[in-house]
Design a protein with these regions (language model features):
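Short amphipathic, positively biased membrane-proximal segments
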Residues: 1-142
Length: 142
């Protein structure tokens, strides 16, 4: 025996997007907090990709981007600051892109870097786009 309007049950289930929003926020916050912390725990790899054209010490930029990443990651966890933090994440992802491009340039000039390492350096460049899009989704949903 079929219940009345049984076919509507599937169609009226809540959309999964709102349920994924907290996961998106927590994933982004965890990534920023983790990578940001690494800027202080092991700064040398980050120092090495700071473009030489920038004035001042590479360590300054390593620590500054680490502070930004940790701060944005923490701000994403608080609903009151989430919207602004998501917008800051977009700006951060755009601002560190030149360092990622510089890493590709440096690794292709360094004979000690293997071909797989060079490929990884290039392959990670397009990942900035989905990171920016995820931050924009958090911004719009906050």
């Amino acid at each position: 025996m079929q219940l009345p309007h049984q076919h509507n049950v599937i169609m009226t289930l809540p959309a999964s997007a709102p349920q994924q929003a907290p996961t998106r926020v927590y994933r982004m916050a965890a990534m920023l907090l983790g990578i940001g912390s690494l800027h202080f725990i092991a700064p040398k790899p980050f120092d090495s990709i700071v473009p030489a054209e920038l004035p001042g010490s590479p360590r300054f930029y390593t620590y500054a981007s680490g502070v930004a990443e940790v701060g944005i990651g923490a701000a994403l966890l608080a609903p009151k600051t989430r919207r602004l933090a998501a917008l800051a994440a977009v700006a951060l992802y755009i601002s560190v892109f030149p360092a990622n491009v510089n890493m590709v340039r440096l690794w292709f000039q360094d004979p000690s870097k293997s071909l797989p390492m060079r490929i990884v350096a290039i392959a990670r460049l397009p990942f900035q786009v989905p990171m920016i899009l995820e931050a924009l989704k958090v911004y719009r949903a906050s």
